[in-house]
Amino acid sequence: MSGPYEKKMAVLTDLSTSSHPVTKDSPTLPESSATDMGYYNGHLSTGQHDFFQTQAYSPTISSYGYPHPPHPQYNFNGLVGNESFLPKDDYQYGYRPFVHYREPPVQETVSVKEEPETEVRMVNGKPKKIRKPRTIYSSYQLAALQRRFQKAQYLALPERAELAAQLGLTQTQVKIWFQNRRSKFKKLYKNGEGPDMEHSPNNSDSMACNSPSSPPIWDNSGSRTPLQQQQQQQSLPQCSSPSYLENYHSWYTQQNQSGQHLQPSEVMHQPPPDTVY
């Protein structure tokens, strides 16, 4: 018991040297420690606990070998004076409001991640993407797109935006339509075929019939009678259509049967009757 007690006294002696230096003539350690303890006890406020709780005869041995109180309690009332020191517990911006504002974004991100993907479906145990529905164009939209495609097969961004706004379509739909039409025409020309009559402007656009019809290769109007010219005008339609070839073929057959044959080479070098030299 004497060993821990002497170590305790040595620690207290070291603390007292900061305010009162120890002289060489100090007889023993217990007298110095007793004086120091009286000094500290006298300067602290009366009626309060000591700055150090001295439990000298019931210590707990620490891992370092010297005794210390199990739960040291400090009293700062003597240092401050009669006023008591109270820490400020309430703050202007607490932690709970911050947590409250941070919780909704976290819940939102989790809910977005948990949404199932509607474009992927399991078919026979394998994921398969659902194909988007095909865009259905009206006859007016097809006619306007076809007219614009005949003018230019490639559209600039402002032109594409303007055309999409006029037809009530998106720019992506107009872009895809032009891409499909270009690839289709390239495939037809590669195979040696012309554009089919189904998608020609004569069938897809009713306003394209206002264009003048192409004249025949040779003109034999000078040798025909007025009755024959009237029959030709009646047989030729006002707009170019698939029936135009049939009417022209029937008219040409009637001309051959009447016995009036003209060589194309002679007619082509023949000047028209109204030419003035």
From Swiss-Prot:
The keyword DNA-binding applies. The keyword Cytoplasm does not apply. SMART domains: HOX. One of its GO terms (cellular component) is nucleus. Residues 1-33, 191-277 are annotated as: Disordered. It is found in: Nucleus. Expressed in the embryonic ectoderm and is specifically repressed in the CNS. High level of expression in adult skin. Residues 14-33, 200-212, 250-263 have a biased composition (Polar residues). Transmembrane segments: none annotated. Residues 226-243 have a biased composition (Low complexity). Residues 130-189 bind DNA. GO terms for biological process: embryonic skeletal system development; epithelial cell differentiation; regulation of transcription by RNA polymerase II. InterPro entries: Distal-less_Homeobox_TF, Distal-less_N, HD, HD_metazoa, Homeobox_CS, Homeodomain-like_sf, HTH_motif. Its main location: nucleus. Signal peptide: none annotated. It comes from the Eukaryota. Keywords: Developmental protein, DNA-binding, Homeobox, Nucleus. Gene3D superfamilies: Homeodomain-like. GO terms for molecular function: DNA-binding transcription factor activity, RNA polymerase II-specific; RNA polymerase II cis-regulatory region sequence-specific DNA binding. Belongs to the distal-less homeobox family. May have a regulatory function in the initial formation of the epidermis. This is Homeobox protein DLL-2. It comes from Xenopus laevis (African clawed frog). The lineage of its organism: Eukaryota, Metazoa, Chordata, Craniata, Vertebrata. The gene is dll2.
